[in-house]
Regions:
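Compositionally biased, intrinsically disordered linkers/stalks adjacent to structured regions
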Residues: 134-160
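Surface-exposed short loop/turn segments
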Residues: 55-58, 66-114, 118, 122-135, ...
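A structural "domain/chain start" motif
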Residues: 7-50, 54-62, 80, 108, ...
C-alpha cells in the first residue's frame, strides 16, 4: 500500500520537497527571549532542534561559519489568559500564546528562505482543581514547546 500511495504522489505532511539539498548543517543559536518568561528560550530552542533533526536529518552546527543554514528566533511575547472558570470562580482553562520572530537563512546562497515577524502558536489547556497553577503552566509550556517546534519545522520543510 505504501508504494501505491507513493506512486500516486501522496506524501506525508512535513516531509515536503522544499528542503534544499545543500542544507546539511544548520546553526540554531538559543532563541532570544524578549518575553521575560524564564527558560522559555531554552525549551523552544531545544524542541526546534529536536524536530529539525528528526524531520530533515540535518546536523546541528554550533559554529555559524561552518553551517549551511542559520535559524534565528526571538520570542516576542508569551501570554497566559484564563478563558474558562469553575463554579467557584477559579480559572479552569487557559489560553497560552507564544509570538516569535523567526528567520531561516541559506548561508550557502546567502538567501532568506523563511521569515515571519509574528509566528504565533496558541494552545489551550485545563487546570485540574487543587493543582498548583505554576506547575501546571510549566508542564503546559513543555508540551507547547514541542507542538510549537513541530508547527515551525513543518512550515520550514513545506516552504511556507
Amino acid at each position: 500500500m505504501v508504494s501505491s500511495l507513493a506512486a500516486c504522489g501522496y506524501h506525508l505532511r512535513g516531509k515536503g520537497s522544499f528542503w534544499p539539498p545543500q542544507m546539511k548543517k544548520v546553526c540554531v543559536p538559543v532563541f532570544k527571549n524578549s518575553s521575560g518568561r524564564f527558560e522559555l528560550d531554552l525549551k523552544l530552542t531545544r524542541s526546534v532542534i529536536n524536530e529539525l533533526v528528526a524531520r530533515t536529518g540535518v546536523t546541528i552546527e554550533p559554529d555559524k561559519g561552518r553551517a549551511d543554514g542559520l535559524l534565528l528566533g526571538d520570542i516576542i511575547s508569551f501570554k497566559v489568559q484564563p478563558i474558562a472558570f469553575s463554579s467557584s470562580g477559579a480559572a479552569s482553562r487557559y489560553k497560552l500564546t507564544i509570538i516569535t520572530s523567526v528567520v531561516f537563512t541559506d548561508l550557502v546562497n546567502q538567501k532568506v528562505l523563511f521569515s515571519d515577524d509574528s509566528f504565533t502558536y496558541v494552545e489551550e489547556y485545563e487546570v485540574a482543581g487543587g493543582v498548583d497553577f505554576e506547575s501546571m503552566e510549566t508542564q503546559a509550556i513543555d508540551r507547547v514547546a514541542e507542538k510549537f517546534a513541530r508547527q515551525l519545522v513543518v512550515n520550514l520543510v513545506e516552504g511556507f
